[in-house]
C-alpha cells in the first residue's frame, strides 16, 4: 500500500520551519509497506510480573534519577521480556480503549504508514495508542517506529491518560513524533530517552485539540527538518531534562497554548530552511499559523533556571500572536549572529496586523542581545529583581511601540542607539554607554528617573478545530470533524 503525503504533514513542516527560515521545501516521503486494516492491536502481553532482572532495572533507574537528573538510556539498558510487532498500515501494536492497562519490559516494533490527518489528529498508525478515557501505564519499554505518520506513544481524547517511565523511544519516519497528545488527552512521562530523525517529528508533540503534557527527566533529541524538540498546541511542562535539536527550533508554541521549562538544558541549532516565508532562524518560535489546529489567544513560554543555548539565528521569534515570555534565572547563550528577540510579521495572518505582541518578564535574569520590534508589533519589557539587559532596542529607528519598565535594582546598558515609546525607571538604572536613547522621540537624559505607561495588548480570541471525544470500537480513531 503506497503511503500518501498529507496536506497536514506538509503544513506542519512548513509551520515549524518556514518562519524559522530554513533551504528547499521538504514534505513527507512516500514509501510502501504491507497492507492491513486499521485499528487492530497486536499486544501479546498486557501486564507482567516483575522478575529479578526487572526489579534491578527499576532500581537502577530510580537511583539514576534520585538527584533530579536522569540517565540517558539505550536499548541495552532495558530488560525485555516480551516483543510486540505490527507492520499493517494504520494499525497499532498496543491499544488501551476505554480500559486500564499496564505494560512493562516490552519491545514494540511498528512499521506501516498512514495517510496523514487521521494519524496526526486521532492516533491512527501509532505504535502505542490510548483512547476513550483509557489509562495506559508503561515502564521499561523500547518503542521503535519506521513509517510515515508513525507516532510512538499517543494519548487521544478527554479523560485519556498515558503514563510512561524509564523507556527508550526511536522514530525514523517523517511525521512521526515521540510522545503525541491530542483531543484533550493527558501524557505523563518520566526519565525517557527519545530520538527522532524524520522531518516534522517533534520528540514531544501535540496537535489538534491539545491536552496536557508533563515530562520529568530524560533526554529528547531531534534531527529532522521542521522537528523541534517540543511542538505545542497544548499545555506542556518539562522539568529536569535535556532537549537538543540539530536542524530545527528547540521549541515551537502555536496559538493559545504554553510551554514551561523548569531546570531544563535546551540546545537548538535551527540551520535548515523549508520556505521563503521568513528569512530568520531561531531557537524558540511563538506564532499562530491560522491552520485551525490551535485556538487563537495569548500564549506563554516560561523558563525557570536551566540553560538555553542557541547555535544559529535569533533566540526568540514572535509572529502573528500575543505572548508572555517569562524568564527567571535562566542562562541564555546566543552563539549565533542573531538577536535576542524579534517580534515581526512573516507569512501568516493578515498583512498589517500579523506582527508579534510580546510581554517579556525578566526576573533575576541576564539578557544579552538586541531586540527588534517591527511596525506591526509591540513589546512590554519588565526588568525585575536584579535583572540586567545589555543590548539595543530598534537601533535602526522607531518602529513598533515599545515600553520598558526597570525595577529598582535592575539595569539596562545600551550597546547602540535605541528607540522606544515609553519608559518607567528609577534614576541611575540606565547606562547609555556612549549611545542615545529616544523615548517617544525625545532624547533621554542619563541619570534621570522616568514614569511611563505600558502598551495595551489586544488579544484576538477564537477556538481552533476541536477534536471529537471518543472513537470507534477497538481503538480506531474517529472520523474527522466536518469543518
Features from the language model and the residues they span:
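Post-signal-peptide, soluble extracytosolic/periplasmic N-terminal scaffold domains
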Residues: 97-105, 110-149, 154-173, 180-193, ...
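C-terminal motif of bacterial Sec signal peptides marking the signal peptidase cleavage site
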Residues: 23-27
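Disordered, low-complexity segments in secreted/periplasmic proteins that are enriched in proline
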Residues: 28-67, 290-293, 349, 463-483
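Extracellular beta-strand/beta-solenoid scaffold signature
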Residues: 65-67, 88-95, 116-129, 147-155, ...
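All-beta strand scaffolds that present successive hydrophobic residues in beta-strands
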Residues: 73-82, 100-105, 135-140, 161-167, ...
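N-terminal segments that cap or nucleate solenoid repeat domains
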Residues: 52-120, 449-457
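Bacterial Sec-dependent N-terminal signal peptides
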Residues: 1-15
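Extracellular beta-solenoid/beta-roll
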Residues: 334-336, 353-458
Amino acid at each position: 500500500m503506497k503511503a500518501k503525503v498529507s496536506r497536514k504533514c506538509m503544513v506542519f513542516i512548513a509551520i515549524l520551519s518556514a518562519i524559522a527560515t530554513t533551504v528547499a521545501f521538504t514534505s513527507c516521503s512516500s514509501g510502501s509497506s504491507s497492507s492491513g486494516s486499521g485499528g487492530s492491536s497486536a499486544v501479546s502481553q498486557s501486564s507482567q510480573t516483575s522478575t529479578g532482572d526487572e526489579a534491578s532495572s527499576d532500581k537502577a533507574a530510580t537511583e539514576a534519577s534520585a538527584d533530579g537528573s536522569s540517565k540517558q538510556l539505550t536499548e541495552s539498558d532495558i530488560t525485555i521480556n516480551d516483543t510486540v510487532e505490527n507492520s499493517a498500515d494504520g494499525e497499532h501494536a498496543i491499544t488501551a480503549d476505554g480500559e486500564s492497562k499496564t505494560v512493562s519490559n516490552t519491545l514494540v516494533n511498528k512499521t506501516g504508514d498512514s495517510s496523514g490527518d487521521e494519524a496526526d489528529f486521532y492516533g491512527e498508525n501509532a505504535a502505542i495508542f490510548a483512547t476513550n478515557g483509557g489509562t495506559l501505564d508503561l515502564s521499561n519499554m523500547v518503542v521503535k517506529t519506521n513509517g510515515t505518520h508513525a507516532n510512538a506513544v499517543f494519548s487521544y481524547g478527554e479523560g485519556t491518560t498515558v503514563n510512561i517511565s524509564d523507556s527508550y523511544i526511536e522514530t525514523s519516519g517523517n511525521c512521526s513524533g515521540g510522545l503525541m497528545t491530542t483531543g484533550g488527552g493527558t501524557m505523563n512521562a518520566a526519565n525517557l530517552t527519545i530520538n527522532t530523525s524524520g522531518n516534522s517529528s517533534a520528540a514531544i508533540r501535540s496537535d489538534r485539540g491539545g491536552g496536557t503534557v508533563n515530562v520529568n527527566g530524560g533526554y529528547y533529541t531531534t534531527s529532522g527538518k521542521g522537528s523541534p524538540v517540543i511542538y505545542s498546541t497544548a499545555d506542556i511542562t518539562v522539568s529536569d531534562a535535556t532537549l537538543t535539536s540539530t536542524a530545527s527550533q528547540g521549541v515551537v508554541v502555536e496559538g493559545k497554548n504554553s510551554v514551561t521549562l523548569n531546570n531544563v538544558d535546551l540546545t537548538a541549532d535551527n540551520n535548515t530552511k523549508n520556505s521563503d516565508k521568513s528569512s530568520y532562524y531561531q531557537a524558540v518560535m511563538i506564532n499562530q499559523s491560522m491552520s485551525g489546529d490551535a485556538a487563537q489567544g495569548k500564549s506563554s513560554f516560561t523558563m525557570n533556571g536551566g540553560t538555553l543555548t542557541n547555535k544559529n539565528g535569533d533566540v526568540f521569534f514572535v509572529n502573528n500572536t500575543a505572548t508572555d515570555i517569562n524568564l527567571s534565572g535562566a542562562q541564555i547563550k546566543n552563539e549565533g549572529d542573531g538577536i535576542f528577540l524579534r517580534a515581526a510579521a512573516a507569512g501568516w495572518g493578515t498583512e498589517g496586523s500579523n506582527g508579534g505582541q510580546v510581554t517579556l518578564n525578566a526576573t533575576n535574569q541576564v539578557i544579552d542581545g538586541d531586540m527588534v520590534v517591527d511596525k506591526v508589533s509591540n513589546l512590554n519589557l519588565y526588568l525585575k529583581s536584579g535583572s540586567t539587559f545589555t543590548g539595543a532596542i530598534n537601533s535602526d529607528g522607531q518602529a513598533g511601540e515599545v515600553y520598558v519598565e526597570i525595577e529598582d535594582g535592575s539595569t539596562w546598558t545600551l550597546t547602540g542607539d535605541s528607540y522606544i515609546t515609553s519608559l518607567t525607571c528609577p534614576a541611575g538604572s540606565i547606562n547609555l554607554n556612549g549611545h542615545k536613547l529616544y523615548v517617544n522621540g525625545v532624547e533621554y537624559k542619563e541619570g534621570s528617573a522616568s514614569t511611563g505607561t505600558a502598551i495595551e495588548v489586544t488579544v484576538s480570541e477564537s477556538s481552533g478545530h476541536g477534536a471529537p471525544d471518543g472513537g470507534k470500537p477497538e481503538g480506531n480513531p474517529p472520523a474527522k470533524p466536518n469543518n
